[in-house]
Amino acid sequence: MSEAVGGVYPQVDLSGGSSRFPEMEENVLSYWKKDDTFQASIDQRDGAEDYVFYDGPPFANGLPHYGHLLTGYVKDIVPRYQTMRGYRVPRVFGWDTHGLPAELEAEKQLGIKDKGEIEAMGLAKFNEYCATSVLQYTKEWEEYVTRQARWVDFENGYKTMDLSFMESVIWAFKELYDKGLIYQGFRVLPYSWAEHTPLSNQETRLDDSYKLRQDPTLTVTFPVTGVVEGSSANAGLVGALALAWTTTPWTLPSNLALAVNPAVTYALVEVAEDGEAEFVGKRVLLAKDLVGSYAKELGAEAVIVSEHPGSELVGLTYEPIFGYFRDHANGFQILGAEYVTTEDGTGIVHQAPAFGEDDMNTCNAAGIEPVIPVDIDGKFTGLVPEYQGQLVFDANKDIIKDLKAAGRVVRHQTIEHSYPHSWRSGEPLIYMALPSWFVNVTEIRDRMVEVNQDIEWMPAHIRDGQFGKWLEGARDWNISRSRYWGSPIPAWVSDNDEYPRVDVYGSLDELEADFGVRPKSLHRPDIDELTRPNPDDPTGKSTMRRVTDVLDVWFDSGSMPFAQVHYPFENKEWFDTHAPADFIVEYIGQTRGWFYLLHVLSTALFDRPAFKKVVAHGIVLGDDGLKMSKSKGNYPNVNEVFDRDGSDAMRWFLMSSPILRGGNLIVTEKGIREGVRQAQLPMWNAYSFLQLYTSKNATWSVDSTDVLDRYILAKLHDLVAETQAALDGTDIAKACDLVRNFCDALTNWYVRRSRDRFWAGDEAHPEAFNTLYTVLETLTRVAAPLLPMTTEVIWRGLTGERSVHLTDFPSAESFPADADLVRTMDEIRGVCSAASSVRKAHKLRNRLPLPGLTVALPDSARLADFASIIRDEVNVKNVDLTSDVDSVGTFEVVVNAKVAGPRLGKDVQRVIKAVKAGNYTREGDVVVADGIELNEGEFTERLVAANPDSTAQIDGVDGLVVLDMEVTEELEAEGWAADAIRGLQDARKNSGFEVSDRISVVVSVPEDKKEWITTHADHIAAEVLATSFEIVTDALDGETHDIVAGVTAKVTKN
C-alpha cells in the first residue's frame, strides 16, 4: 500500500468534479462555445493548404435521425484530423430547401390535398410558406449537431433557395444546354400521380422506393386477322389467337401493337379437350419454350400443330382488345423486338407505347404514335368512357371483368412483386409518356466511367461494383418537375408554334439584359412574370414565356460544390483550384443519389470527378435487425443515450463498427455502453491513476530505460504511426481498433505492472510518472478526433493549455521504436492471458498461487529475461520455457463438411480422408489437403494435448501454455492471506480512511486458520499499512468487518 498525493492534476478541470462522461461533455461544449475554439482551429491554419470537404445538405423540415448522427460523426472526425495534420478545413453547413420534400411537408401543414388547392391559394403564398416551413427545425438541428461535438459553421451556411445558389444552378443548366447536353423530349417516365410530377430513374432506385405489392396478371387473346401489306408474315396463322401476358391490365385499353422476338421459336397449339373449356379446339400462338407453362389452360393432350420463327409473326394484324382506338394509324399489328424474352409470360408482349419505354421505342420505329387516355391524377379520361374518372389501379377490377365477359381471358392470377413507389408520398408510380427536359447522360456515360477510376472509394469494391455498374447503365436524367417550389428551368419558349424560339439564361445579368429588370427572386411566380415579345415573330404577337416546370431537387444537390460559393460569379479562382473535393461521406444508397448526380454534373461541366475520396457507409438498423421505426421503438432514444452515456460513447460505438466498411449495424444500448469500456474508461482510469499519485508536475520524456516504460513508448510509436496511416486512408474503424488495443495494453498491462513504482512515488521513480504523462498527452492527441470531448478533458487537465484540438497530430519519430521488445512483451501478455483463461475455466481465483506454468513457444529462450513478469502476473511459483511445442500439444485440422461440401462436391470425402491421414499443409487461413484448397470456415482446429484441461493456445502465435493446478496447503494458505489483504483493504475504504492513513487491526480467525494468518501476519500488516496487528480467536465486540469466510476484523485509524 502506498500514499496517495495528488493535487497536481488537473491543471484545468473540465470534469466539474464529476466522473460521469455526459456531465463532462456539457462542460466541454460550454467551454468551446465561450472560447470559440472551433474558429480558432480554422484561424490558426490561415495560409495553410485547404482540405476541401463537401457536406451533403439535409432538409431542415424534419428532425435528424441515426443516419444523420452516423454521417455527422465521420464529417467531424475527418476535418478534425486533417486540421491536426496542418490543413485549413472550413466546414460550412448547408440546407436542402427545395423540391417535393419541402412541398409535401407544407401541404401537410396547410391541410392541402391536391395541386388545385395550391393554385387557389396562390403560388406566391404557397412558396412563401415553403420557404418558412423548410427551415422549421434548424434550431433543433443546430442543437443536435452541437451535442454531437461536431464542429461546423452554421452562421455562414448556405441554403439552396438563396438567390446566389440558384443563380449558379441556372448557370449550370445553360452551360449544359450550350454543350448540347440538355434537350426537351417526349419520353416514358416514372410518374407520381399523387404529386403530379415525373421522377427520374435514379429516384426510383432510392431506399424504400420499391415495395412489395399485389397486382393482377392476365393472359389475354388477340385474334389474328390478316397480314400487313408488303410484309412477309405467315398468312397461314390468320385465325389463331395470339396470347400476351401483362402485369398491368389497366394499360390494355391503350394497346396499339404486340411484339415478338424474330429469333424466338413460336408454337401454334391446339387446345385439348381437358384444357380451358372456353378455348377447346382453338389454336393459340405463344413461344414454344413457354407451352409447358400453360399446360393447365392448354390441356395435357394439347398438340403443337406447327412451329414458326418469330419473324413469320411480324406483320400479322389482330383484332383490338378494346375498340377505342381502332382507326389509329399503323396500329394493331405484330412487331419485331429483340428485348422480348421467354423468361416468363408467353413470349408475346402487349404494347402500350404511352406506358412503357420499350413499347414506345418499338412503336415509334413502326410509325405508331402513343395515345394517352390518363390524366395528371392517374385517372382515365373520356377517351375510354367506361373507365373515365377511375384511378388506373382501381380500374383493373372492371377491366378484367369486361375482358372475361368478352371471352378474352385465358389466365387470371394475382402476383406479389416489387414495384416502384414515390420516395416521398409512398404511392405506387405509373410509367407514362410526358414532355420533359433531360440531361443527355448517355452522351457522357463512357467519360463518367473513365473519371470514376480517379476516385478512391471506401469500400473499394463500390467503384467498379455498385457505382461502376450503375454508371455503365446510366440513362438520360429527367430534370423537369411539374411543381412549384424549386430552382426554375431557365428556358423561355415562344407561345406560338408558328414562330418557334427557345432562349436559355444562365445569370441575373442575362435576364436583366433581355427583360429590362433584374430579378430579386428566381422562384415562381416571380420568375414566371418575366415575359417579352418573341424577337423571331415579325408580327409581334407572340410572347416568350418561361416553361412552367422547376428543376429536380437533385439538380440543386448536384450543384452544391460550385453553387455554395456562387461560382462562377464569385470565388472562381478558388473553386477552380480547390476542386475536386478531398473527401465526402454519405450512406451507400447515395451511389444512386447524391454521389451519382455530383458525378454527372462535374463530368458534364468540368470533365473531372466531383470528389477524390468517398466513404459509402452501411445502414443503421434497430435492435431487432430491422429498419429503425418510431412505431416499433426498436432503437435507443438518441437524447437518452447522450444523457446516460454521452456523445463520445455513441461516436465510438458507431465509428468502431463494420458500418464504415460498408456493412450494416444494429444499434443496441449494450453496444453503446461497451464502447465506453473500450477506450473512454481505460483512458480516464490511467489519467486518474496519474492524478492520484503525482506530487509534482511530470515532464514530457521518452528517455526511460525501464523495460515497461520502453515497451509502452515503443507501443506508442506504433500507435501514432499506424493510426496516422489509418486516418490518412480514412479507415476510421481501424483507427478505433488501434486505440482500443493500445488502451488495453496501457491499463491492463503497463499501469498494472508498474503499480509498485507509482506507489513508491515520483521522487523514487520519476521516469514512471514522466512516461505515463507522455503517453497520456500523446494518446489524447491521437484519439482527439475519435473522442473529442473525453480527450479535451484529459489533455487540458494534463497541460492546462487551450485545447487538444489546436495541437498537431503527434509524429511517430518522437518516440523510440523497438519492434523486438513490443513483439516479445505482447507475446508475454498473450502467455499470461492464455494461462488466465485456464485458471478461469477451473474457477481458480487469481490470488491463489499455483505451482508452475509451462510455456511452449518457438524460440522461447528470448522470453527468459521476462520469466519473473510471467511468474508474478500469472501468480505461479515457477515458469518453464520450452521450444518443443509438439511435446506439449498439437492442433488437428477437422473438415467442416457442411460448409465445404456444397463447394467441393464429391471431393469433400477425398479431403476428409487426406486430413485424417495428416496429408495436408496449412498457411495462414488456408489448408491444402491432397492438392485441394480449404478456405476459412471450411475447417476448424482441435487441440490434442497430454493434459487438454490445463492447456491453452497463446493467441496470435503458434504456442501453448500448460498450467500446473495442483494446490498444496502452503499455496492455499498464501492465497488465503492474499484474500485477507483484499478484505482488509475494503474495510479501510468502507471506514472512510485516506489511502495514506496508518491503522490498527484486530482480526478474529477460526482456530484452523490461526496458523495461516500467523505465518503471513507481517506481510498482511505491511500491505494494509497496519502499525498494530492483533490476532484473536474470540468473537469481536462492536463494529466489525467481514474479511474472508469466517474471519472478521476491527480497523481503527491511528
From Swiss-Prot:
The protein's organism comes out as Corynebacterium glutamicum (strain ATCC 13032 / DSM 20300 / JCM 1318 / BCRC 11384 / CCUG 27702 / LMG 3730 / NBRC 12168 / NCIMB 10025 / NRRL B-2784 / 534)
Q: Which family does it belong to?
A: Belongs to the class-I aminoacyl-tRNA synthetase family. IleS type 2 subfamily.
Spell out the subcellular localization from the entry: Cytoplasm
For domains, the record's comment is:
IleRS has two distinct active sites: one for aminoacylation and one for editing. The misactivated valine is translocated from the active site to the editing site, which sterically excludes the correctly activated isoleucine. The single editing site contains two valyl binding pockets, one specific for each substrate (Val-AMP or Val-tRNA(Ile)).
- Protein name per Swiss-Prot or TrEMBL: Isoleucine--tRNA ligase
The entry describes its oligomerization and partners as: Monomer.
Q: What is its EC number?
A: 6.1.1.5
SUPFAM superfamilies, per this entry? Anticodon-binding domain of a subclass of class I aminoacyl-tRNA synthetases, Nucleotidylyl transferase, ValRS/IleRS/LeuRS editing domain
* Function description: Catalyzes the attachment of isoleucine to tRNA(Ile). As IleRS can inadvertently accommodate and process structurally similar amino acids such as valine, to avoid such errors it has two additional distinct tRNA(Ile)-dependent editing activities. One activity is designated as 'pretransfer' editing and involves the hydrolysis of activated Val-AMP. The other activity is designated 'posttransfer' editing and involves deacylation of mischarged Val-tRNA(Ile).
> Is Zinc given among the entry's keywords?
yes
Q: Which gene encodes it?
A: ileS
Its needed co-factors are: Zn(2+)
Q: Coiled coil: which residue ranges? A: none
Q: Where is this motif: 'KMSKS' region?
A: 627-631
The UniProt keyword set, sorted, is: Aminoacyl-tRNA synthetase, ATP-binding, Cytoplasm, Ligase, Metal-binding, Nucleotide-binding, Protein biosynthesis, Zinc
